Amino acid sequence: VRAAAQRMAALIDDLLNLSRVTRTALQPKFINLSKIVEEIAQSLQESQPNRQVTFSITPDLMVEGDPRLLHIVLENLLSNAWKFTSKQEKTVIEFGQKAHAKERTFYVRDNGVGFDMAYADKLFGVFQRLHSISEFPGTGVGLATVQRIIAIHGGRIWAESAEGKGTTFYFTL
C-alpha cells in the first residue's frame, strides 16, 4: 500500500509539473548547457558512487533559453540515461552537439538497454513506457514534459535507438 501511495504521489507531482510547464512564460537568458549537464552528472554520481559511469561532456555549449526549463529537460534526459544504463557493467553517457540540417542539434547518448524504433512514436506521450515498471521505475511523464519544454523553445526532439545498444536523444532549440 505504501509503495502504491508513493507511486501515486510521484505521478501527481509529475502531472502537476507537466501542467506548469505548458503554462510557463519563457524567461530566456544566455546559458551554458554544458555546465548544467556537469552539475546533473555530479549529482547522479553522488547518488550512486559505486557505479562505473563515464560522462563525456562537450564544454561550453551556449544557448539562449529558459535556464529553469532547460535544466528540467537535461535532468530528465540524463536521469533516463542513468536509469536505462543501470544494468551495464561500464556506462558511458555523452552530451554534445552536432550539425544537423543547418540547425544546432544537441544530444544525450547512452550505451544502455535501448528500445525498438518501431515504438519511437510513443516515446513522448503521457504515461507511455517502453519498459515495464518492474524493470525500470518511472511515471511515464518525463519525456512528455521534455517535449513540451523543447516545443516552447521553438525546437524539436527525437530519438534513435537499438535494443541492447543504447539510445541517443537529439533536440534543437
Kindly give the residue locations of the regions a language model identified:
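Short alpha-helical Gxxx[C/S/T] motif in the catalytic ATP-binding
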Residues: 1, 142, 146
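Short alpha-helical segment of the dimerization/phosphotransfer core of two-component systems
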Residues: 3-8
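A conserved beta-strand-to-alpha-helix junction within the catalytic ATP-binding
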Residues: 27-42, 94-97
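Conserved catalytic submotifs in the C-terminal HATPase_c
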Residues: 29, 49-62, 98
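Short beta-strand/loop element within the Bergerat-fold HATPase_c
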Residues: 90-102
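Short conserved segment of the HATPase_c
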Residues: 115-127
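Glycine-rich ATP-binding loops of the HATPase_c
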Residues: 154-160
